[in-house]
């Protein structure tokens, strides 16, 4: 069981990568991310987010969706744990690298080159939806993800937050909150930098 906590924080920051500045929410710019992923530098880590690792402990593997999968670090981890994984990203290069890594590891991974606006989440199709460092949550997202998840399915979210403190919570009032943070902390892929980060693990209520 995760802790539920609300933490006051002070600042937000921009992450600076080897090819320039990244403004979160820019994931739909495929040409930009193709350039980032094509540098040959190890810009992003390949291990999964700690939040996701903890979120699936004790859960039976099922169908998982990784929104904005990038190079596939979370998708590949889930596939290694026995989940049936679909991931998508608008970056052809990111998806290519994810497919390549999965193949080398002998893993089955459905990796698609598509933007979020063109991907049909479906209805009661997923046991897990993951969205890390893609964009900020919008008010209508909670309903969309609830429809797409099966009963007791979970949504795992992590991103920089430049909005109001704890605003994310009001979008998920009907959900069971397993973990929440809105903190000034280090990113898991840039531990030397302090960023304002929000993390959420929420479970869809069982069908009545």
Language model features: what each stretch is:
Residues 84-89:
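Conserved SAM-binding motif I beta-strand of class I
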Residues 119-128:
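A short acidic, Gly/Pro-enriched loop at the edge of an enzyme's catalytic core
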Residues 140-151:
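A short glycine-rich, Lys/Arg-flanked "PGG" loop and its adjoining helix->strand segment in the class I
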Residues 91-93:
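Conserved SAM/SAH-binding beta-strand->alpha-helix loop
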Residues 105-116:
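Conserved SAM-binding strand-loop segment of SAM-dependent methyltransferases
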Residues 152-160:
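Conserved beta-strand signature within the Rossmann-like core of class I S-adenosyl-L-methionine
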Residues 98-99:
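Conserved SAM-binding loop
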Residues 61-70:
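Conserved class I S-adenosyl-L-methionine
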